[in-house]
From Swiss-Prot:
Start and end residues of each PPIase FKBP-type domain: 50-138, 167-253
Protein name: Peptidyl-prolyl cis-trans isomerase FKBP4
Signal sequence annotation: none
EC annotation from Swiss-Prot or TrEMBL: 5.2.1.8
Activity regulation description: Inhibited by FK506.
SMART domains (alphabetical): TPR (SM00028)
Entry keyword annotation includes Transmembrane helix: no
UniProt cross-references to InterPro entries, sorted A to Z: FKBP4/5/8-like, PPIase_dom_sf, PPIase_FKBP_dom, TPR-like_helical_dom_sf, TPR_2, TPR_rpt
Organism: Oryctolagus cuniculus
Domains: entry comment: The C-terminal region (AA 375-458) is required to prevent tubulin polymerization. The PPIase activity is mainly due to the first PPIase FKBP-type domain (1-138 AA).
Ranges for region Interaction with tubulin: 267-400
Xref: Pfam families: FKBP_C, TPR_1, TPR_2
């Protein structure tokens, strides 16, 4: 029976008391949730905790009174399974359904609206009956932009509400799959942010930071959150590959948050992290280095309790971090971000040689030649012996000359075409066969003929 057939069958038919029947699917086996399958679904998969599910439903009281129906609204109802967005009976029952399945669910009050009811349609302590049809379900998108790059499906819910933060020590068991081929199977203990050194994709670390202790989840990673356009030769993963991971977060120890650290701790940790970032940078692990330098900025940027001596140390670390961030962004070809990091560095030291030079490089990379030239000229004004700036300024000048030459040629061709068209039009007018001239002659003949006709008729 389809959703439309359900609606047709229900119209006026549910007037007699409804029977209590079905298989007990309540966790306590207390007959709190009874289920009868009216039409089998397809496939073998059922929704998991956190999945977005899409259903049509109709609800009745036990006396047959209908109190709600998504069919009447002609709009499917959706919710996140297992998140407490609906009554308990629904979270329990829909988790057992397959796509296309139609079932009847009978819910005791403690699995529905309890002693409070849901006025005015549902009285206190009401047993409810629903018919539910499952159309679709999909995993939870964990990306900031909701671009579908990291999809999570929770096999087993974790405990509590705490989650690993950046720098937390996590203990995980994982399996990585590429097209059903198991390519990675390990138990690891590592610091969040260090995953790249263990050949873990960035999307996996990002997902781990959304997990709870004891959680077992399936993760689907798009290429930009997996091994990207480089692939991973060690695992025989080609470029632009989509991956699947099964991850069990066994335990974790949270790192101290910024607000939990003293000013002295922040400076000590920043110095350690700076060295770690430098090691990653030298190894060509620019994303890893980026994470380290970002930590320093987050710890020090808004700290107001430093002593006068600590302020100088903090400023030096912040300046170095912004400059190093700019260098990482340049290596990763994130040129706008590189400019932003240079600007932050130049706010701390307006004549900083590296800040001006790296900003010039970022401008040059995106063909902002005038801005790049200004930065390189400023470097040479302040530091005349900077050979790299001289070389880059020469590149700028050369590209600006080429750009001017291209524009001159473009405009010359444009003006030449316009002149040719103008001369051609003049020649056609002189010959009397210009389209506009012909049209005007036709119009004059039409007008003359009309006038003659009017005069004759008059």
């Amino acid at each position: 029976m389809t959703a439309e057939e359900m609606k047709a069958a229900e119209s006026g038919a549910q007037s007699a008391p409804l029977p209590l029947e079905g298989v007990d699917i309540s966790p306590k086996q207390d007959e709190g949730v009874l289920k009868v399958i009216k039409r089998e679904g397809t496939g073998t998969e059922t929704p998991m905790i956190g999945d977005r599910v899409f259903v049509h439903y109709t609800g009745w009281l036990l006396d047959g009174t209908k109190f709600d129906s998504s069919l009447d609204r002609k709009d499917k109802f959706s919710f996140d399974l297992g998140k407490g967005e609906v009554i308990k009976a629904w979270d329990i029952a829909v988790a057992t359904m397959k796509v296309g399945e139609l079932c009847r669910i009978t819910c005791k009050p403690e699995y529905a609206y309890g002693s409070a009811g849901s006025p005015p349609k549902i009285p206190p302590n009401a047993t409810l009956v629903f018919e539910v049809e499952l159309f679709e379900f999909k995993g939870e998108d964990l990306t900031d932009d909701e671009d579908g790059g990291i999809i999570r499906r929770i096999r087993t819910r974790g405990e509590g509400y705490a989650r690993p933060n950046d720098g937390a020590i996590v203990e995980v068991a994982l399996e990585g799959y590429y097209k059903d081929r198991l390519f990675d199977q390990r138990e690891l203990r590592f610091e969040v942010g260090e995953g790249e050194s263990l050949d873990l994709p960035c999307g996996l670390e990002k997902a781990i930071q959304r997990m709870e202790k004891g959680e077992h989840s399936i993760l689907y990673l798009k290429p930009s959150y997996a091994f990207g356009n480089a692939g991973k030769e060690k695992f025989q993963i080609p470029p632009y590959a989509e991956l699947k991971y099964e991850v069990h977060l066994k335990s974790f120890e949270k790192a101290k948050e910024s607000w939990e650290m003293s000013s002295e701790e922040k400076l000590e940790q920043s110095a350690i992290v700076k060295e770690r970032g430098t090691v990653y940078f030298k190894e060509g692990k620019y994303k890893q280095a980026l994470l380290q330098y970002k930590k320093i900025v987050s710890w020090l940027e808004y700290e107001s309790s430093f002593s006068s001596e600590e302020v100088q140390k903090a400023q030096a670390l912040r300046l170095a971090s912004h400059l190093n961030l700019a260098m990482c962004h340049l290596k990763l070809q994130a040129f706008s971000a590189a400019v932003e990091s240079c600007n932050k560095a130049l706010e701390l030291d307006s004549n900083n040689e590296k800040g001006l030079f790296r900003r010039g490089e970022a401008h040059l990379a995106v063909n902002d030649f005038d801005l790049a030239r200004a930065d390189f000229q400023k470097v040479l004004q302040l530091y005349p012996s900077n050979k790299a700036a001289k070389a880059q300024l020469a590149v700028c000048q050369q590209r600006i000359r080429k750009q001017i030459a291209r524009e001159k040629k473009l405009y010359a061709n444009m003006f030449e075409r316009l002149a040719e068209e103008e001369n051609k039009a003049k020649a056609e007018v002189a010959a009397g066969d210009h389209p506009m001239d012909t049209e005007m002659k036709d119009e004059r003949n039409d007008v003359a003929g009309s006038q003659s006709q009017v005069e004759t008729e008059a």
